[in-house]
Amino acid sequence: MKIAVTKFLGTNCDLDVCHAVKLAGGEPELVFFTQENLDSYKGAVIPGGFSYGDYLRAGAISARTPIIKGLKKMVEEGKPVLGICNGAQIGLEAGFSKGTLTNNLNAKFICKWVYIRVENNKTPFTQYYKKGEVLKIPIAHAEGRFYADDETLDYMYKNNMIVFKYCDETGEVTEEANPNGSIDNIAGVCNENQNCVLLMPHPERASEKILGSDDGLKMFKGMIDYAKRI
């Protein structure tokens, strides 16, 4: 089960993602941003990092490289595509979902463990979680604050495009549990067809208990199992 793991200039979480994909039973393969054709892959993960130094804004340059055409085709064909941190920024810049990611409210880089609540368990990546389940996953970003205008946000709620929200350990969505000022505590979103998920927390860094949590591993297992069925 070949899964493309994208590699841009400045990507630094690719090997961690490859490890998580292997743990989930997949066969990860690093694919550079110059490659446009991804037809031989059953899914893709866009890992985190600081592609192109986050110049202009995070993900803006990467979203204009050749591989985006192949990723868009994957999304349109219903293949599972996961964007993590910088990968989520790239995915939103490329138009894979609605909304945008901008500077954290405190204007600082934030690196810590957080809790997120599953709002939508109908995606390939969340199929093995219960709706309302609380996951312990770390974040590491400076431009992770999700924003969408009222009209866009209403559209996203109506189409079940909100996948994760920041919460406390008990699952309560509070202002104190929001690390970056994201509107409605939103930590992850998806497209209308539910096969592309973009989130700021790093599930690959929570894929083994020795890391402090293995709550993120089910995202990769869900992806692999979904890819086997399509």
Swiss-Prot record:
Annotated active site: C85 (nucleophile), H202, E204
Which named protein is this?
A: Phosphoribosylformylglycinamidine synthase subunit PurQ
Provide the assembly information. Part of the FGAM synthase complex composed of 1 PurL, 1 PurQ and 2 PurS subunits.
- Record-linked PANTHER family: PHOSPHORIBOSYLFORMYLGLYCINAMIDINE SYNTHASE SUBUNIT PURQ
Pfam families tied to this protein? GATase_5
Cite the InterPro entries for this sequence: Class_I_gatase-like, PRibForGlyAmidine_synth_PurQ
Described purpose of this protein according to its UniProt entry:
Part of the phosphoribosylformylglycinamidine synthase complex involved in the purines biosynthetic pathway. Catalyzes the ATP-dependent conversion of formylglycinamide ribonucleotide (FGAR) and glutamine to yield formylglycinamidine ribonucleotide (FGAM) and glutamate. The FGAM synthase complex is composed of three subunits. PurQ produces an ammonia molecule by converting glutamine to glutamate. PurL transfers the ammonia molecule to FGAR to form FGAM in an ATP-dependent manner.
SMART domains, A to Z? GATase_5 (SM01211)
Task: Kindly list the places in or outside the cell where this protein is found, as annotated in its UniProt entry.
Answer: Cytoplasm
The EC designation for this entry is 6.3.5.3, 3.5.1.2
Name the source organism. Answer: Methanocaldococcus jannaschii (strain ATCC 43067 / DSM 2661 / JAL-1 / JCM 10045 / NBRC 100440)
Q: Domain Glutamine amidotransferase type-1 spans what residues?
A: 2-230
Main location per the UniProt record = cytoplasm
Q: Which Gene3D superfamilies match?
A: 3.40.50.880
Q: Keyword Lipid metabolism, does the record have it?
A: no
Q: In which pathway does it act?
A: Purine metabolism; IMP biosynthesis via de novo pathway; 5-amino-1-(5-phospho-D-ribosyl)imidazole from N(2)-formyl-N(1)-(5-phospho-D-ribosyl)glycinamide: step 1/2
Q: Which GO terms describe its biological process?
A: 'de novo' IMP biosynthetic process
Keyword field: ATP-binding, Cytoplasm, Glutamine amidotransferase, Hydrolase, Ligase, Nucleotide-binding, Purine biosynthesis
A single cellular component GO annotation: cytoplasm
Instruction: Provide a Gene Ontology MF annotation, just one.
Output: ATP binding
